[in-house]
Amino acid sequence: MLTQLKTYPKLLKHYEEIKEVHMRDWFSKDKERASRYFVQLESLSLDYSKNRLNDTTLKLLFELAKDCSLKEKIEAMFKGEKINTTEKRAVLHTALRSLNDAEILLDNMEVLKSVRSVLKRMRAFSDSVRSGKRLGYTNQVITDIVNIGIGGSDLGALMVCTALKRYGHPRLKMHFVSNVDGTQILDVLEKINPASTLFIVASKTFSTQETLTNALTARKWFVERSGDEKHIAKHFVAVSTNKEAVQQFGIDEHNMFEFWDFVGGRYSLWSAIGLSIMIYLGKKNFNALLKGAYLMDEHFRNAPFESNLPVLMGLIGVWYINFFQSKSHLIAPYDQYLRHFPKFIQQLDMESNGKRISKKGEIIPYDTCPVVWGDMGINAQHAFFQLLHQGTHLIPIDFIASLDKKPNAKGHHEILFSNVLAQAQAFMKGKSYEEALGELLSKGLDKDEAKDLAHHRVFFGNRPSNILLLEKISPSNIGALVALYEHKVFVQGVIWDINSFDQWGVELGKELAVPILQELEGHKSNAYFDSSTRHLIELYKNYNQ
């Protein structure tokens, strides 16, 4: 456990020594701070100079990582050891994008051979849709793709297709359905033509309640309009491992794309779950996405901790969570194309590390994953940055931006990028009472009024942030960015001694929903309901009589 590691008391002592130091002082004393605390991997870079740390902090954090055998655990993951201990599974999302020739054997399966076989089928299928060779039941080309999934079968594909819209096929419109509410699927069905729509049903077991409910609604709508169930074969494909259930649905087994237990949902966009991505972007751009992730994989596996991007970000996060007692972490992308990135990282981070039981089954006596949240930065400035600047919470921030200007939008990117730099500087530097008072007096305010108002215009600063810069929003850079966060999550899971690759926390609510659903549908359940739940069940039933 973290608190039992030999470096932990050293970090506690060091924290007490520097907790009141202001970053302004470090910057004023060290003119090389920005260049020293900067790491670049091809066209992705990290400026971590605006963090409340110094060389001693980093040295101790690297020692902490060594205490946890981080290097050895990284290797264990890449080699296919069953590090998902509660489910007795390997964790090999890295194999989905591997360019290595060295085969990985897992329970007598040749992993890379299997992965590349599925990729080959995905490429052939996506080519047929994009080229117009694959036609609908009236011989129309496919114009709309509807991806039906939830969680990891939705968020990754949605995020990537949105981020890389400039690379998408101009004929294809992408739609993503995850919510079982009914509104979302009905809204999508209103917009599309059954004769030119391809539905992708993404569910490993092909039994996920939300996904199957939406898929059956889409199926019913399609059959009513096409007039014959046989047309399902041309318009529905599945990403699943349950061949029997897929065939019962009416989907041809040749239109089923498999994936494996060694790939968790939130790590699965590189697999057949990314079929919608490949269809939209094409195989060349999908390959670039994989290549960017592989580049980050190799960096994570081989770079020394001192210049290792995921290791640095993971350890810096631990520094704030377990020593500064930070409870929250903000993701602030300054790019409209990255608007879904925060909620993708929410799932990746919180479903992986939102746990309080160690690998040995013991209750952990320290904080683990913070609340991860965010929005597009420029909008957030006018919504909740007030709290970040002058509120009572210490909330570290990841600013994410690109250097590349958008075409046909002169002056826009300069304004956007200036705000990234200004916000990061403001969070670090702040504004003292004396500075605020001087500004007010220079504007001609009465001295007594200025003294009172100046208190409200103080920014304490010393608010930490990372700045992640991409040269441009491209497939390879998005691949590298996602892999960076995947590995950062892994690093923190190792430090906290938790299994980052199960998600038992999603199960209890699903189990309890079964008897409640029986009651709502008019059937009697033998389950016990607390008085609140029973009252609300009756309220619903009475309203809908």
UniProtKB/Swiss-Prot annotation:
GO terms for biological process: gluconeogenesis; glucose 6-phosphate metabolic process; glycolytic process. The active site is at E351, H382, K510. Keywords: Cytoplasm, Gluconeogenesis, Glycolysis, Isomerase. Pfam families: PGI. InterPro entries: G6P_Isomerase, G6P_Isomerase_C, Phosphoglucose_isomerase_CS, SIS_dom_sf, SIS_PGI_1, SIS_PGI_2. It catalyses: alpha-D-glucose 6-phosphate = beta-D-fructose 6-phosphate. It is an enzyme of class 5 (isomerase). The keyword Isomerase applies. It comes from the Bacteria. Its EC number is 5.3.1.9. Pathway: Carbohydrate biosynthesis; gluconeogenesis; Carbohydrate degradation; glycolysis; D-glyceraldehyde 3-phosphate and glycerone phosphate from D-glucose: step 2/4. One of its GO terms (molecular function) is glucose-6-phosphate isomerase activity. PROSITE patterns: P_GLUCOSE_ISOMERASE_1 (PS00765), P_GLUCOSE_ISOMERASE_2 (PS00174), P_GLUCOSE_ISOMERASE_3 (PS51463). CDD domains: SIS_PGI_1, SIS_PGI_2. One of its GO terms (cellular component) is cytosol. It is found in: Cytoplasm. The keyword Lipoprotein does not apply. Catalyzes the reversible isomerization of glucose-6-phosphate to fructose-6-phosphate. Belongs to the GPI family. This is Glucose-6-phosphate isomerase. It comes from Helicobacter pylori (strain J99 / ATCC 700824). The gene is pgi.
